[in-house]
Structures are given as C-alpha cells and as structure tokens.
C-alpha cells in the first residue's frame, strides 16, 4: 500500500489524469444508461425505417438539409423541438423516431426532449450522418 502512495506522490499529474479519466468514464456510462433514447447504427436505422415505419428527424440547418439528407427525413430545427412544435411528428408518437445531426452530438438534447414529450421509441443515429456516409448509405439532395 505504501508503494502506491509513494507512486501517487511522485507522479501527481499522471495520477490526476487517471482519476479524471476514470470519473469521465463513469459519468459517460451513467449518462448513457439513464438516457431516454438509445443510440443505433446506420444499419439499425434502415431496419427501423423499412420494417417498423421509422421516421428520421434531421435537426441540421436548412442549408445542410438541402445539401443531403436521408430519404423521407423530416426536417425540424432544435429550436422547434424545444418550443414543442413537432409539426408532422405529432401524430406519430408510437412510431420509431430516429434523430439525426451531422455528428450525433447535437441531436442528444433533441432526442431527450422528444422522449420527454411522449414519443415512445426515440433513437439517435450514433455518430450522425458521418456514420451514415461511412456506411455508404444514400443521401437525397434538394428540398423535401
């Protein structure tokens, strides 16, 4: 035990980095286990869309949406979700909802808000449209 104490005292910065990483890892595990949504892959997204009538909700800007989006995706801004304006999603609360952004990071809050608003099956495309493109999945360009 004294050897550990001596090591930590001699390598204080290294020890603090390890403690910080451990705390961050624990926080990440707790956050993902308590999230109101689940993260899914591009393949799981296509299965939800094709087999369970899943709806893709793209929360990127209008310009980004026009440059390329998943087929049949619904474009809703995060500000609309925060305000409770769900548009065409309002009558699809029991259908699978897949929230998509560019990287999968900014969609987390929107996914949580949708789940809290009563949407029963909310998912998040893990790593966003970057993962979708890396899986060689198609994007539709233009207004839709």
Where are these regions (language model features)?
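Short, solvent-exposed loop/turn elements at beta->coil junctions and helix N-caps
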Residues: 45
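Rhodanese-like catalytic fold shared by cysteine-dependent sulfurtransferases
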Residues: 1-39, 48, 54, 62-96, ...
């Amino acid at each position: 035990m004294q050897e550990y104490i001596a090591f930590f005292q001699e390598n204080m910065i290294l020890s603090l980095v390890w403690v910080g990483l451990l705390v961050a890892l624990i926080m990440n595990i707790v956050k993902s286990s308590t999230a109101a949504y689940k993260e899914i892959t591009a393949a799981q997204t296509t299965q939800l869309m094709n087999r369970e009538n899943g709806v893709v909700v793209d929360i990127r800007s209008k310009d980004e949406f026009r440059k390329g989006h998943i087929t049949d995706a619904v474009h809703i801004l995060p500000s609309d979700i925060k305000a409770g304006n769900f548009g065409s999603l309002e009558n699809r609360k029991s259908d699978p909802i897949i929230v998509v952004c560019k990287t999968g990071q900014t969609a987390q809050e929107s996914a949580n808000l949708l789940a809290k608003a009563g949407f029963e099956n909310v998912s998040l495309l893990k790593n966003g449209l970057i993962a979708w493109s890396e899986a060689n999945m198609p994007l539709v360009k233009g207004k839709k």
